[in-house]
């Protein structure tokens, strides 16, 4: 019989495959659409008529659903770091299908992500799934988790009310800090809702419990806040910088929140916990390396010829332009 951890592992890996592939499908769809109309980056919507873009969107939807269900079966310490595999999938597929070459350092980044993921999978704790949403509520009402929530919300409020007006446009940690803290609470709430849905399908109805709807409301609020400030970060700063920092902060805070609320590491020996932490650090290192190679590619100048309209063709100027695309 398949264990919950094995089911969560399969779903998490499937999610990464779907999401990583969806980026390539959507990008190819955008390129086709750009050849027939205005690019999306310049306000065009011709991609909505491109079937390949829709295939990518559906693929991403399947990936997000698989990721959601994975949290129901496995602890966050197993599921969350495996999200880095989607970066590997997209990088490898982009190398072969989009002619976006994967450099040697990028290959090392992929290797680090794979090695770290294997370490986490081997030493991941076996989670004890609660038998009712009321049990999850008791876990959420533990003093340690309430302190985590209080500290997180205090930091979020301080960042929004004080730091954002002062340095939101210059300090990348303001926006990313907000969406990472809210993201950790999103995962905890979504996991609670997912377990309630799973128990309901198994015949133990959890829909009419007020705790279920409270967790659903918290999840909705946190998701909206998370998306608002992630979009602000992407709009203000380079995506090649935002992505690795956000991944590191979001993953770290999610694992901390899950360890406090669900006691993921209870019953594990020190060696297993140390191995998981080492695996996690290895995945983070690989992710940063992968994104740094992309940032280098972005910074490589493209030489372009242009003609001054007031001068002859022989008086052509050369200028180096940096590509705005990520």
From Swiss-Prot:
Cleaved signal peptide residues: none
BP-aspect Gene Ontology terms: magnesium ion transport
First-listed, main subcellular location of the protein, grouped into a coarse class: membrane
Topological domains annotated Cytoplasmic: 26-51, 98-104, 164-169, 231-240, 294-326
S-S bridge residues: none
Annotated coiled-coil segments of the chain: none
Topology, Extracellular side: 1-4, 73-76, 126-142, 191-209, 262-272
The keyword RNA-binding appears for this protein: no
Record keywords, A-Z: Cell membrane, Endosome, Ion transport, Magnesium, Membrane, Transmembrane, Transmembrane helix, Transport
GO cellular component: early endosome; plasma membrane
SUBUNIT field: Homodimer.
Matching PANTHER family: MAGNESIUM TRANSPORTER NIPA7-RELATED (PTHR12570:SF62), PTHR12570
Protein name, per record: Probable magnesium transporter NIPA7
Taxon lineage: Eukaryota, Viridiplantae, Streptophyta, Embryophyta, Tracheophyta
